[in-house]
Amino acid sequence: MMGTEGTGRSDNPLVNKLAANEATTCLPIRMSRSIHVLQMAKVAGFDSVYFDMEHGTFSLDDVSALSLAAWNMGLTPLVRVPNHSREHIVRTLDGGAAGIIVPQVSTAIEARAIVEAARFRPRGTRALAGASPPLGYAPISADAGSAILEARTLVIVMAETVEAIANADAICAVDGIDMILVGAGDLSDELGIHGQSGDPRIRAAFEAVAAACRRHGRWLGVAGVKQQPDVIRDLRSIGASFISASTDESLLLKAIITEAQNLAATFTGRAS
């Protein structure tokens, strides 16, 4: 698999679990800037977290500090960058993220540009930023630093459109891509079946991407199906090894609403 080629075992625990074909979980963080939510994710058993710069309001300073904190807790820190910008990809990784999730990738041309930004030579043109946060400011050679970061870094692209599903094989064929993360939410929106992850058309899309991942040695990720256990089990059976959970804000909101409803029923007598 990508991320370990030519450099031995990665120091990224998520990479090593994926390479062992273990099922892995990720908590998306969109709201919290506190390291305490990272401690909660760790004690809950999540393998990784991702900080959402596409739909959240994180700054680069935010995701850098949180990425380093997550790393020190044994969680793999990923960042969903806001777009395909090379600047966001490079600065996010230089700030300490162990991988990027790039939204709305629909063609092999887009995937190649992402690899160009995220990978070191010969697969990309990322430059080593010298003594830097992801290396703990260790005084090591450029060759050694590049090898460590190349083995650590996960390059994940999201397939969220009908075009992306049609191009899954070509996207998977791009050297340097590690994972295709199928976004069932946006895909179901485009198909006019919002949220219906069990629809045969969504299942066919996952199967098409799964087959492409098998052919090219990529990992298959799942997003947008967390409330549907039967669908999740089915996707695991066809090769999915990474799943994105509900966001921190949605989990908190759900808990707050449930608590308010319980108190309304047992104490205040007011319907909420």
Residues covered by each model-derived region:
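N-terminal amphipathic alpha-helix/helix-capping segment at the start of soluble metabolic enzymes
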Residues: 1-28, 138-151, 207-215, 271-272
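C-terminal alpha-helical cap/extension of soluble enzyme domains
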Residues: 4, 85, 126-138, 159-166, ...
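Alpha-helix-loop-beta-strand connector modules within alpha/beta enzyme cores
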Residues: 60-94, 116-124, 147-150, 198-220, ...
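Conserved anion-binding
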Residues: 87, 99-175, 186-189
